[in-house]
Amino acid sequence: MSGGSRSSQIRSIRFALQVKGVEATARVLGIRLQHLEARGSDDLESAFSATARERADALLVTGSSTFLTHRARIAELAMKGRLPTMLSFRESVAAGGLMAYAVNMADFVQHAAVYVEKILKGAKPADLPVEQPTKFELIINLKTAKALGVAIPQLLLLRANEVIQ
């Protein structure tokens, strides 16, 4: 890896893996993808304008702290464009997004605290195993679904960990 900070390089790799997984699933389902890039709030308007030009049926927002930071604006633009949106954070759904399949943040933070405790007690970070989150939650915003005219199947509602009325 060359150029950029280590954390930005890791984010780039994580994003590439997310995209690869989405592309593979889209191929299996016969869904045409349109890639849009938004690195900050200034890019959101143009990205949503592109979804309108391309007549997108829905939007998948990948997990990024940028998108978490601008969750209210993303929800607003999605509603304005009448675009059902799948997000990566529970907070984004609470801000008005349609749905998310997201890491349970309380579980994630608790797990991170265990790592910090081990390091503070003398463990070398390089010796600790890399672990992925294992608990995910489905969150659905019925108020947003109604406003968009999207019917959420009863089976999906029953599987949801949280339904926002």
Describe the function of each predicted region.
Residues 1-165:
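Short hydrophobic alpha-helices and adjacent helix-cap/hinge residues
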